[in-house]
Amino acid sequence: MRSVSSAGGGSTYNSDNADSLLLAFQSTLDLIADEASTMVSPGVAVNQSQRFQHLDEMYFSLFKPLQNSFWNGNLKRYRVGIQGGEATFYDAAGSNAMSGSDFSASARSWWSRSVDGADIMLGGARDRLQTSSRRLYYTAAPGGSLRQFDLNDFTNAQLLLPPEATDAVRTNVANELLNMWGDPLHSRPLMVNYGGTGSGENFVEDNIVFVSTNAGMLHAIDTSNGDEKFAFMPYEFISKASSYTVNRLPLAGGNKRQTYGLDGSWSVLRVPGATIQDAPEKVMIYGGMRRGGNSYFALDVTNVTSPELAWQISGSTGDFVDMGQTWSTPKVALFPGRVPVVIFGGGYSPADHDDHKERRSQDEKGNAIYVVNALTGELVWSAGSRNANVQETVPEMTHSIPGSIAVVDVDADGVVDHLYFADLGGQLFRADIDGSASANHKVELLAQLGGTGENHRRFYEQPTVSYVREGNKSIYYVSLASGYRSHPLDVDTQDALFVLRDQVPFGGAEQTVATLTDFTNVSTGAEPDTTKRGWYMPLNKAEGEKSLSSPAVFNYEVLFTTYSPRSAADDESDPCSVSYGQSYLHRVDLLTGEGERSTLLQPGLPPGVTVLFGENNETAIVVGTETVSADSPDDDDDDDDEPNVRSLRQGRWMQLTPDGAGAIKQP
């Protein structure tokens, strides 16, 4: 494998005294460089006319940190070309858009009227608001119907303005609401197809990309020209409009932001039309708030110029009393009875993990999973440890579950059979979904991989499930990596990558709960013991190394990124040196754990891995704005000794008829 980069890209602040060192550190804004940055994987979509490859369009969520709680953001589009197993990003003029891991100063992204380079205030979807007016929809109460914004409908109090606020101040609030772009810090762009024109090689897709920001808005962008079709701002944020516009709050103590918004990623339910040219019969999208709050929103965007709020679910009430901050990206699937559902974890509990490094016996919020009807939002099934609040009581579900849920369909009938999820107590679970009329769903604790002290491992992200055929055995390999996302500077925890073998879904014998002793430590050079439950690899090559995203599995490899707060500075011997830290890409064999680690150019917290599929079976691996060869380190033509490995993808609900089966559309 070619090296991802030849040198580290860490940024360092030097100081000759403790006071100025503190100021220098605070200016790093939680390890995010003071430049155009991205912390989520780029948005990509499947080609509707060539279902086994991606479109050549890449969408980057970009932001620039400021010395207050409001950060500016943008969405930019580039073209991606794959050749020789590596990807290249091109600008609108056809030139290489990158200089190292940064956007070239001479690059002009799609939709931009002039060169915009790495400046997030120029070009992109943000720039298009200069030439088109924003259609802003809001809810006047939680869960209320959508209304189009009109300043005359609001009192000063409804905008969080003082009674004496003048008309000029009110106008400034309105102007900001109709023009601002906040930071899409954790929101990965979601592209949805709305049909198209032409056929074959001349087929031109009509696509919309959705992304949300910490300014409290969801944006729907026409990919052909960058124009905004609409923006949505729920009551929870428009009722505090002054905080996002004319009275932006400073950073609080400890360099913490005080203002968040719709910072989650979105998922889609899409019912296709009769042909790929036809508009879909139904499009609904689902997303949460992360640190912005404890609600999920479902929008009917079948008519993208006239969205409707289908439903809103909020934590701490009714069936969702245990739900915390909504970090888990919803998964759309079919439940038994072919009921379209949305599946998500119980969320994040800031009271238990923001300021408490010790392991608690039970988190206040988030220690549950939920399955709701995708069309109505009504609860279908839930599981957790508090029996009065959930349908299935699982005493071991004591810690919050901010990650997404891995959805598995064993028999390829389109209906969920198993769910895999992990929690902030270092535990891994599997839910077995009963397809019979009794609907006797159950949850099994598979592994306890956390503990106290240096073993207090937290799983913030979704496990990755791969199907492996070993001789006459079918096995699921479940990959997950730990890391204290809420405290990336932590150096006290021994984090690790774990790969667990699970044969129970294929009729294997039930197993006891696995602990660390049931896994082979492959960092010692030992071969995985097939009599054990799996293997693990301590992240100990750099101090405080941790993983902050889900692994990807491709070509018999587990690919995942890590971050170390201490390893980037060449002058670490200088006690007055503070670094952004260093990010890495790991590529290890799924079955044996053998592999290598490469240094990434981009400083700070890295996004996860994206595997791109292009024309002529070309593939490439992308990490944020960097690319690496998709060839395995030990790639050769003789793979007779390799078992059959297939990485499982989440199911999506598609309404199919026998004559329409060839027209499946998947965003």
Spans of features found by a protein language model:
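A fold-level detector for beta-propeller and closely related beta-sheet-rich head/sensor domains
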Residues: 1-667
